[in-house]
Amino acid sequence: MNYHSTNVNEIWDACLRILQDIVDERAYRTWFLPIIPVSIEGDTLTLQVPSQFFCEFLEGNFVEQLRTVLGRVIGPNASLQYNALVDNSSPKYPGTVTLAGCADGGQAAEQFDVNLLHRHMPNAATHSEAQDFDTQLNSRLNFRNFYQSECNYVARSVAEAIAASPGNTPMNPFFIYGASGVGKTHLCHALGLRVREMHPRLKVLYVSSHLFEMQFTTAARMGTINDFIAFYQQVDVLIIDDIQWLIGKKKTQLAFFQVFNHLYMLGKQIVLTSDKPPVDLNGMEERLVTRMAGATCVKIERPDLKLRREILQQRTLQSGVRLDESVLNFIAENVCDNVRELEGTLVSLITNSVVVGKEIDLTFAKRIVRQAVRLEKKEVTIECIQQAVSRVFQVQIEQMKSKSRKQDIVQARQVVMFLSKKHTAQSLSAIGELMGGRNHATVLHGCRCVTNEMEMNASFRSSVERAEQLIAN
């Protein structure tokens, strides 16, 4: 042992000091600080990691650094053993993983516990078949222009690990969630494109859940549902964006469940995105929620200041426009919600500058940015509408969702349906599902009742308008 101590905490502290110098700060904080040293026996160091996924990620991305550290601190015969805490979301991978240290640069020997589930690589199509397959991927949305910061670092790291070995890691399925415009779609395309680069024989498919639902509806109308399901079951890497749009569409959910199960059992990679975590997908079938809750779930946070500045700098370079630092800082500090809003504000600023023939100084930027931010509409949700209607009509939300036929409760329920149809992009089925499991015909009837009553009853119309004002504010 090179480090003259038998205290495991001292040995791991020595390892951390070296690691801090050879990996970047984000990686150090994310992947090494959570590790707990357990024991040192001879030349074998045992560490406790939060999950099997954590362990696999370390092996896949930091094995060379770990070899270096083990060699310097423990010696050339060092070995590293992980005790992975078993979490309920990943029951497939219990047990311990051992990685023999190779400080002399030799090949590492990875020994997995025998009770780990055997993982099959996807059956590969021929090269020509995979290349001819329409992936629906956008080549402009790649890892090279997916800018990284604290808010998306873990999601990107996991996506890159998956792309290196799709379907052959514990990160399957991979569930990405976060607010609209934070980069979920970009990351999905980048992951798919990287798989195509590294594994040209694999069939990769990106599809929005809206398109999936439209294709299913067409197949149902034409009596070709089996062909529809068979098409999706041939895919090696399936990426479905905005899975929350399947809420309330029970038949489409059933078809998706069949595809999901088939691909999962064959070891194919599944990637899903949503604006909320699986447990909050009210209106999704319980068995689907259970499958998704068992995925590796990673949230992309809203862009931090560092990321907003970097995006603005890169976009201005690409557009050939030079902006003063004070202008960049003002935009970055005041347009905070998402990347889409940030880029839209920059485009608006440049366009206004060209149209009026005025140089972009701080005064000009403040005027345009304030207009853009003020014009940005607040996202309206059904939950927000329920709260507003409950307050105005003095009916509890749970009463609205109940089976009660009392006139005041029915009326409040119908107002929620009416305003949800008017102010959100949710389907009638999704609205009905969130209003106590009602069908689209009930929602449509409720909307008509509200419209008719508003035409005849000024007091009722005033109450509906008050609810709308609450929603807007």
Swiss-Prot record:
It comes from the Bacteria. Residues 1-76 are annotated as: Domain I, interacts with DnaA modulators. It is found in: Cytoplasm. ATP binds at G181, G183, K184, T185. CDD domains: AAA, Bac_DnaA_C. Keywords: ATP-binding, Cytoplasm, DNA replication, DNA-binding, Lipid-binding, Nucleotide-binding. Its main location: cytoplasm. Residues 76-135 are annotated as: Domain II. One of its GO terms (biological process) is DNA replication initiation. Residues 354-473 are annotated as: Domain IV, binds dsDNA. Residues 136-353 are annotated as: Domain III, AAA+ region. GO terms for cellular component: cytoplasm; plasma membrane. Plays an essential role in the initiation and regulation of chromosomal replication. ATP-DnaA binds to the origin of replication (oriC) to initiate formation of the DNA replication initiation complex once per cell cycle. Binds the DnaA box (a 9 base pair repeat at the origin) and separates the double-stranded (ds)DNA. Forms a right-handed helical filament on oriC DNA; dsDNA binds to the exterior of the filament while single-stranded (ss)DNA is stabiized in the filament's interior. HAMAP family: DnaA_bact. Belongs to the DnaA family. Domain I is involved in oligomerization and binding regulators, domain II is flexibile and of varying length in different bacteria, domain III forms the AAA+ region, while domain IV binds dsDNA. Oligomerizes as a right-handed, spiral filament on DNA at oriC. This is Chromosomal replication initiator protein DnaA. The lineage of its organism: Bacteria, Pseudomonadati, Bacteroidota, Bacteroidia, Bacteroidales. The gene is dnaA.
